[in-house]
């Protein structure tokens, strides 16, 4: 019984290490998003850190339009990054979890 517990504890530690490694890797995964007309471009990591914002000079003439573009485009980029992040972290966690009877449906 204690051997099984130690095995499960080791598996949990491995799963935690795998999740941490995945988080670090997601710092290098870039997500690009742009406004519908391409005048605003944003690049963020899958961990939702902004890396670059490119604004066409045409947008500098209208502050309200620029603000709207920033909000919409940032939200789309964050949504994409969050989907990637959750899928990758979830897969890493699920892959490393020990087989515990009755827990099958919790990590889907």
Swiss-Prot record:
The keyword S-adenosyl-L-methionine does not apply. SUPFAM superfamilies: YbaB-like. One of its GO terms (cellular component) is bacterial nucleoid. GO terms for molecular function: DNA binding. InterPro entries: YbaB-like_sf, YbaB/EbfC. Its main location: cytoplasm. Gene3D superfamilies: Nucleoid-associated protein YbaB-like domain. It is found in: Cytoplasm, Nucleoid. The keyword Isomerase does not apply. Keywords: Cytoplasm, DNA-binding. Binds to DNA and alters its conformation. May be involved in regulation of gene expression, nucleoid organization and DNA protection. PANTHER family: NUCLEOID-ASSOCIATED PROTEIN YBAB. Homodimer. HAMAP family: DNA_YbaB_EbfC (MF_00274). Belongs to the YbaB/EbfC family. This is Nucleoid-associated protein GFO_1796. It comes from Christiangramia forsetii (strain DSM 17595 / CGMCC 1.15422 / KT0803).
